Amino acid sequence: MTGFSADRLLLFGATGDLAKRMLLPSLCALDADELLDPKLEIVGTARSDLDDHGFRNFAREALEQFLPADRRSGMASFLNRLSYQPLDASALDGFDRLAEKVGTPEQGLAIFLSTAPSLFEPTIRGLQHGGLSGERVRIGLEKPLGIDLASSHVINDAVATAFPEDRTFRIDHYLGKETVQNLLALRFANIMFEPLWNATHIDHVQITVAETVGLEGRVGFYDDAGALRDMVQNHMLQLLSLVAMEPPVNYDATAVRDEKVKVLRSLRPVEVSETVTGQYRSGAIGGQAVPGYDDELGKDSDTETFVAIKAHIDNWRWKNVPFYLRTGKRLPERTTEIMVQFRRVPHSIFPGKAARGEPNKLVIGIQPAENITLSLMAKVPGLDRDGIRLRGVPLDIAMPDAFAGPQRRIAYERLLLDLIEGDQTLFVRRDEVEAQWEWVDAIRAEWEEHGLTPKTYTAGSWGPSAAIALAERDGVTWHE
């Protein structure tokens, strides 16, 4: 914790899509559960020309659309917390008026900054100009934080002129998901897994982040970024680091992030033969015809909408264990999961093909369903006169069913509450971000050097056939 709980929250981009779908519903839900300090005031700012009343109407419509009815209790009192100040971030004098609107917090100010990368520097200068960057102010930064290591340096250096690292909260919303946090509990609160969590007992790990959607209004950003920078550089590498990290000394921000960055720095440079890129063409998803990427974009493009990578972590625990990463748009289903495949038993005592055991698998479902499945080998019931027959049996834990009482929360609820209260454990430190970019930039450099262009795949499929071959040449099948 950084010493104070804020009693003012300043939301940049307060009339944008993220605020409408995630931030305002999350804050209202926290308020309904009495998790926000009664003194907390929330000031929204954006270019939209609204007053307090207009912003409250905007927020009410957002809550009615995106927050379930059973979580809207006390919506009227939440709306009374809200006020609004229009702002052109490129004009310094606007920050004087914004500072007047924010007022003088008794305890401290938390800022949530979601803006285009080009506006980070002028916004930070404006906050300094308006006196909104003092010792009792912390800032949360929503991606994208650059498009490569160099631009990330520029943004982080600009932020550091006003906010030291202990008051800078870089957001990766995947870390706010309950099952992602549960990965640490699964590993470090259960003695059965940790002794096996290494190259001696694990054959390989798969991490899949699949989307059914296409561009969905992110045309400009996505065509500049592509799947590697949009998904792998942040979300997927954070998941990988949680799977692979050493046990931290304790569960606090410094200890957890120290171990994550060790993993990221141990990532082996990827050869071009260990990657596959793709771009979707027209097809069908859920029985509905969908256009190809170029059709949605309105022009030809070499941007990848799919990437598969065979990664390695060069340290003692994970030497030569492949980590297969796969993400893409317009895939058959929306799913995020981690699959850990253990090695086969070294010798089977059971004779015959029917007794051939399959390796154990641990599957951690992150979205849409939050579940944990461990596959074990068991004897098929019956009188086995020709020898025991074995079959894999799944042990399923559906997390919402296992914990029937707690609400299923939006990932941003956890992150906004931690930003307000000053807990950095689930936020990304600068050295993590830079280690991620360094690895991703090297992959992009390999692509450019070898003139790699995306292979095509049909929307509704699991990507280019080359992605299947990437795993199958190692005797591995993607978990689907």
Language-model features and meaning:
Residues 1-140, 145-480:
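Secretory/organelle targeting and membrane-embedding segments
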